[in-house]
Amino acid sequence: LWPEVIDLFAGVEVILHAGDLHTLSVVEELGKLGPVYVARGNGDVGIVDDRLQDAWVLSLGSFTIGMIHHFPSPVRKTSQQLHKYMRRHFKTVPDVVVYGHTHLESIQDVDGVLCVNPGSPTLPRNQSLRYGHVGVMDLAGDRPLAVLYELFDGGFRAL
């Protein structure tokens, strides 16, 4: 885990990891900053820990957050298909969906649902080990806000 991630996440209340940890040490390191929830990814086979689940439905602030590793791309599916997928996996249509798998950073609004793929801090776009992206959400207002950050040696910048 890059030290830039630790710097960016300093002061956050909760950390949501959309999967593909590959090692539990990532959760241990992030856990020093706050509670960690992980959506089990295809790169997490064999990792057993209560902080990993196939899908999460969390109440954070006044919002419902659904988190899952595999989620259809909002640019490739209709909102009706995406809402059906949400109800199947979360039993509801949450305010925010956090997902991973593709390692492609993206923020899309799907009929009022904020769909966030933060990308990957270490394997962006499923390529070689290098600096990538993370996301940060602000849930203090009347609408959830998400910002993607690009990591680089010694820092980070909002996209």
Segments predicted by a language model, with ranges:
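Short, flexible, glycine/charge-rich loop motifs used to bind or transfer phosphoryl groups or to couple energy/partner
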Residues: P3-D7, V26-E29, A55-W56, K84-R88, ...
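Short, catalytically relevant binding-site loops at active-site mouths
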Residues: H22-L24, D44-V45, P72-P74, L104, ...
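Divalent metal-coordination and catalytic microenvironments
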Residues: I15, D20, L30, G41, ...
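Helix-adjacent hinge/juxtasegments
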Residues: Y37-R88
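N-terminal active-site segment of His-dependent metallophosphoesterases
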Residues: L1-V36, V48-Q53, S62, R130-Y131, ...
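Active-site-proximal loop/helix segment associated with metal-binding centers of metalloenzymes
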Residues: T64, S73, L123-R125, G154
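Conserved beta-sheet core of the metallophosphoesterase superfamily
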Residues: Y37-A39, R76-V147
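Short, solvent-exposed aromatic-acidic interface loops
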Residues: V147-A158
